[in-house]
Amino acid sequence: MKEILITNDDGFEALGIRALRNALKDIAKVTVVAPSSEKSACAHSITLTRPLRFIQLDDGFFKLDDATPSDCIYLALETMYKHKKPDLIISGINHGANLGEDITYSGTCGGAMEGTLQGVASMAISLLYKNDSIDKYGFDLACEISADIVKNIFENGFPLNGREFLNLNIPAVPKNEYKGLKIVPAGHQAYNTNAELHRNPRGLEYYWLGTPNIHYLKENDNECDLAVTFDGYASLTPIKLDMTAHHSINRLKSWI
């Protein structure tokens, strides 16, 4: 039987990871190793300044105390899968989309990156939400789409080369409004950052980083992950770990 290792950045109690585990249990042997608390926007960070401890919650279900998604994958592969790697690593289902440059912040994508670095086929899965869409529609559509892709991977092989992972984003729509799956590149966003200044009772200043106001120019980017996901499609994007701007190499040589 195929084996799948799952993590996330919303923590072990999140509805998304539990729904995904349940959706895949008849397809493969599923093991969950998730952070003990929410680690959104931790990117591909790993923990080097303190020890990490597995806590078993159920058969095949573990939380890693105060860990990041990348920690979870790193340590699971080093211990549970020391002698035989899983057939697939999935990070998700995230409560919120990871589109465009969100990928660079995303702990969900960070988990998939770690799996890719370790030579395992990996996928990040995220569900867009608008207002109360997750409360209204739940994770049924996301689980159905995810399960179909997993079956395809197991039947036909992982479609990407080494050092590449799949980034899947599901729209915030009910099943009857879902338009289908599109293979598209990552889009480009404009981030208007925000930080709120506060003072504690002793007058010391501190800041909360606010949620950035994000937008993109749809007329210039009609077939990107941002455009299609907000339009009711699921987007599937191949992401590579090589961040080199190859087209700028010669320009940089001439500049030096």
Curated annotation (Swiss-Prot):
Subcellular location as annotated: Cytoplasm
Positions that bind a divalent metal cation: 9-10, 40, 94
EC number(s) from the headed UniProt entry: 3.1.3.5
GO molecular function: 3'-nucleotidase activity; 5'-nucleotidase activity; exopolyphosphatase activity; metal ion binding; nucleotide binding
Alphabetical list of Pfam families matching this protein: SurE
Catalytic reactions on record: a ribonucleoside 5'-phosphate + H2O = a ribonucleoside + phosphate
Residues spanning the membrane: none
Main location: cytoplasm
Enzyme class: hydrolase
Keyword match NADP: no
Function summary: Nucleotidase that shows phosphatase activity on nucleoside 5'-monophosphates.
Family: Belongs to the SurE nucleotidase family.
Name of the protein: 5'-nucleotidase SurE
Organism: Campylobacter fetus subsp. fetus (strain 82-40)
UniProt gene name: surE
